Protein backbone atom coordinates (compact mmCIF):
# COMPACT_ATOMS: atom_id res chain seq x y z
CA UNK A 1 0.00 0.00 0.00
CA UNK A 2 1.39 3.39 -1.00
CA UNK A 3 1.06 6.36 1.33
CA UNK A 4 0.10 9.74 -0.14
CA UNK A 5 3.06 12.06 -0.67
CA UNK A 6 1.52 14.73 1.54
CA UNK A 7 0.82 12.37 4.45
CA UNK A 8 1.68 14.01 7.73
CA UNK A 9 1.65 17.52 6.23
CA UNK A 10 -1.09 20.04 6.81
CA UNK A 11 -3.07 21.03 3.74
CA UNK A 12 -2.42 24.61 2.71
CA UNK A 13 -4.94 26.08 0.26
CA UNK A 14 -3.47 27.71 -2.82
CA UNK A 15 -2.75 31.39 -2.41
CA UNK A 16 -5.48 33.52 -3.99
CA UNK A 17 -4.02 35.87 -6.61
CA UNK A 18 -7.21 37.23 -8.20
CA UNK A 19 -10.08 39.00 -6.44
CA UNK A 20 -13.42 40.03 -7.96
CA UNK A 21 -16.24 42.40 -7.04
CA UNK A 22 -18.62 39.61 -8.07
CA UNK A 23 -17.46 37.42 -5.19
CA UNK A 24 -18.99 37.67 -1.71
CA UNK A 25 -15.49 37.78 -0.26
CA UNK A 26 -12.08 36.21 -0.60
CA UNK A 27 -11.72 32.43 -1.00
CA UNK A 28 -9.59 31.80 2.13
CA UNK A 29 -10.47 34.59 4.57
CA UNK A 30 -8.24 35.57 7.46
CA UNK A 31 -9.08 37.68 10.50
CA UNK A 32 -8.50 41.39 9.87
CA UNK A 33 -6.16 42.76 12.56
CA UNK A 34 -7.40 45.72 14.62
CA UNK A 35 -4.62 48.03 13.35
CA UNK A 36 -5.69 47.30 9.74
CA UNK A 37 -9.31 48.18 10.60
CA UNK A 38 -8.06 51.42 12.17
CA UNK A 39 -6.20 52.31 8.96
CA UNK A 40 -9.26 51.39 6.86
CA UNK A 41 -11.44 53.67 9.02
CA UNK A 42 -9.34 56.62 7.78
CA UNK A 43 -10.06 55.88 4.09
CA UNK A 44 -12.30 58.61 2.62
CA UNK A 45 -15.03 56.25 1.33
CA UNK A 46 -15.03 54.20 4.52
CA UNK A 47 -15.11 57.33 6.68
CA UNK A 48 -18.10 58.65 4.70
CA UNK A 49 -19.95 55.35 5.19
CA UNK A 50 -19.15 55.36 8.92
CA UNK A 51 -20.64 58.87 9.15
CA UNK A 52 -23.69 57.80 7.10
CA UNK A 53 -24.24 54.84 9.47
CA UNK A 54 -23.63 57.03 12.54
CA UNK A 55 -20.71 54.88 13.69
CA UNK A 56 -17.49 56.11 15.31
CA UNK A 57 -14.26 54.95 13.63
CA UNK A 58 -13.49 52.70 16.62
CA UNK A 59 -16.63 50.66 15.84
CA UNK A 60 -15.83 49.96 12.19
CA UNK A 61 -17.51 46.63 11.34
CA UNK A 62 -15.06 43.99 10.14
CA UNK A 63 -18.03 42.54 8.18
CA UNK A 64 -17.58 45.39 5.67
CA UNK A 65 -14.35 43.73 4.49
CA UNK A 66 -12.84 40.40 3.53
CA UNK A 67 -9.08 39.73 3.75
CA UNK A 68 -6.71 37.17 2.30
CA UNK A 69 -3.07 36.44 3.13
CA UNK A 70 -0.76 36.74 0.12
CA UNK A 71 2.98 36.86 -0.57
CA UNK A 72 3.54 40.02 -2.60
CA UNK A 73 7.31 39.92 -2.15
CA UNK A 74 9.86 37.12 -1.83
CA UNK A 75 9.83 37.56 1.96
CA UNK A 76 8.19 34.85 4.04
CA UNK A 77 5.89 37.42 5.62
CA UNK A 78 2.25 37.25 4.60
CA UNK A 79 0.77 40.50 3.34
CA UNK A 80 -2.97 41.19 3.32
CA UNK A 81 -5.26 41.96 0.42
CA UNK A 82 -8.47 43.45 1.79
CA UNK A 83 -11.57 43.98 -0.34
CA UNK A 84 -14.75 45.79 0.58
CA UNK A 85 -17.79 43.53 0.69
CA UNK A 86 -20.25 45.68 2.60
CA UNK A 87 -21.70 49.12 2.07
CA UNK A 88 -18.42 50.52 0.73
CA UNK A 89 -18.81 48.25 -2.31
CA UNK A 90 -20.38 49.64 -5.49
CA UNK A 91 -22.33 48.09 -8.34
CA UNK A 92 -19.91 45.65 -10.01
CA UNK A 93 -16.95 47.43 -8.44
CA UNK A 94 -15.19 47.32 -5.10
CA UNK A 95 -12.26 48.80 -3.22
CA UNK A 96 -9.03 46.92 -2.61
CA UNK A 97 -6.24 47.62 -0.13
CA UNK A 98 -2.90 45.88 0.42
CA UNK A 99 -1.08 45.88 3.76
CA UNK A 100 2.52 44.99 4.55
CA UNK A 101 3.34 43.54 7.98
CA UNK A 102 5.76 45.56 10.13
CA UNK A 103 7.21 45.11 13.62
CA UNK A 104 4.52 47.43 14.99
CA UNK A 105 1.52 46.31 12.92
CA UNK A 106 0.80 46.96 9.24
CA UNK A 107 1.48 49.62 6.61
CA UNK A 108 -0.99 50.47 3.87
CA UNK A 109 0.90 50.00 0.58
CA UNK A 110 -1.93 49.97 -1.99
CA UNK A 111 -5.39 51.45 -2.45
CA UNK A 112 -7.41 51.02 -5.62
CA UNK A 113 -10.84 50.26 -6.95
CA UNK A 114 -12.22 48.20 -9.77
CA UNK A 115 -14.01 45.03 -10.74
CA UNK A 116 -10.97 42.75 -10.43
CA UNK A 117 -7.58 42.88 -8.73
CA UNK A 118 -4.84 40.45 -9.79
CA UNK A 119 -1.44 40.01 -8.14
CA UNK A 120 0.66 39.20 -11.20
CA UNK A 121 3.68 36.92 -11.46
CA UNK A 122 5.76 39.76 -12.94
CA UNK A 123 7.71 41.70 -10.34
CA UNK A 124 9.19 45.15 -9.84
CA UNK A 125 11.54 45.94 -6.94
CA UNK A 126 10.96 42.38 -5.72
CA UNK A 127 7.18 42.81 -5.45
CA UNK A 128 4.41 41.39 -7.62
CA UNK A 129 2.81 43.89 -9.96
CA UNK A 130 -0.85 44.55 -9.18
CA UNK A 131 -3.39 44.93 -11.98
CA UNK A 132 -6.93 46.25 -11.64
CA UNK A 133 -9.66 45.92 -14.25
CA UNK A 134 -12.87 47.90 -14.48
CA UNK A 135 -15.44 48.91 -17.07
CA UNK A 136 -15.45 52.64 -17.82
CA UNK A 137 -17.64 54.24 -20.50
CA UNK A 138 -18.33 50.79 -22.00
CA UNK A 139 -14.59 50.16 -22.31
CA UNK A 140 -12.21 47.93 -20.37
CA UNK A 141 -9.83 49.95 -18.20
CA UNK A 142 -6.65 48.18 -17.08
CA UNK A 143 -4.27 49.78 -14.59
CA UNK A 144 -0.94 48.21 -13.61
CA UNK A 145 0.70 49.26 -10.34
CA UNK A 146 4.33 48.76 -9.34
CA UNK A 147 5.98 48.89 -5.95
CA UNK A 148 8.28 51.94 -5.65
CA UNK A 149 10.03 50.81 -2.45
CA UNK A 150 7.39 52.31 -0.17
CA UNK A 151 4.02 51.71 -1.80
CA UNK A 152 2.34 50.73 -5.05
CA UNK A 153 2.03 53.51 -7.62
CA UNK A 154 0.29 53.68 -10.96
CA UNK A 155 2.62 52.48 -13.73
CA UNK A 156 0.53 51.90 -16.85
CA UNK A 157 -3.06 52.56 -17.94
CA UNK A 158 -4.88 51.06 -20.91
CA UNK A 159 -8.42 51.71 -22.16
CA UNK A 160 -9.72 49.38 -24.87
CA UNK A 161 -12.94 48.28 -26.52
CA UNK A 162 -14.71 45.38 -24.85
CA UNK A 163 -14.53 42.36 -27.11
Where are each of the predicted segments found?
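Surface-exposed loop/turn elements that mediate protein-protein interactions on large endomembrane-trafficking
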Residues: 97-111, 145-156
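Short, exposed beta-strand/loop patches in secreted or surface proteins that constitute
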Residues: 67-73, 114-125
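Acidic/hydrophobic-patterned starts of short beta strands in beta-sheet-rich repeat architectures
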Residues: 71-85, 124-133
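Acidic, small-residue rich beta-repeat scaffolds with periodic aromatic anchors
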Residues: 1-47, 119-163
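Structural motif
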Residues: 89-97, 138-144
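Short consensus segments that form the blades of beta-propeller domains
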Residues: 57, 85-91, 134-136
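Signature of short aromatic-glycine-proline-rich micro-motifs recurring in repeat-based ectodomains
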Residues: 57-69
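A short beta-strand motif characteristic of beta-propeller blades
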Residues: 54-59, 107-110
Amino acid sequence: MCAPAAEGKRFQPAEQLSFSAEDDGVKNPVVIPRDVLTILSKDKLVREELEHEGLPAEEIPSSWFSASAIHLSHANAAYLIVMSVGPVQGANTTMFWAFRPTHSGHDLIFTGGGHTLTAKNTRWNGYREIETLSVVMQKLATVVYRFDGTRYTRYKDKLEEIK
